[in-house]
């Protein structure tokens, strides 16, 4: 049986940290003129994925 491959798209998007998986916010790439300054500011930086998505991300990254 060959080794399971990691989903390369997921490997580019998620980073394992001590407290969970880090990811960049969505809706921050283009057509930002319609979006308010407050909304753009809130989407800055990165955050941790929610507890309901941890199992899905780990499966894509072949953690378990």
UniProtKB/Swiss-Prot annotation:
Any Pfam family the entry gives: Ribosomal_L35p
Gene Ontology terms: biological process: translation
Highest taxon of the lineage: Bacteria
GO MF annotation terms: structural constituent of ribosome
Keywords: Ribonucleoprotein, Ribosomal protein
Family note: Belongs to the bacterial ribosomal protein bL35 family.
Name this polypeptide is given: Large ribosomal subunit protein bL35
Organism: Ectopseudomonas mendocina (strain ymp) (Pseudomonas mendocina)
Taxonomic classification: Bacteria, Pseudomonadati, Pseudomonadota, Gammaproteobacteria, Pseudomonadales
């Amino acid at each position: 049986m060959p080794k399971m491959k990691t989903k390369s798209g997921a490997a580019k998007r998620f980073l394992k940290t001590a407290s969970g998986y880090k990811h960049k916010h969505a809706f921050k790439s283009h057509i930002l003129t319609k979006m308010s300054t407050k909304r753009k500011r809130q989407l800055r930086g990165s955050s941790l994925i929610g507890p309901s998505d941890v199992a899905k991300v780990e499966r894509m990254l072949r953690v378990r």
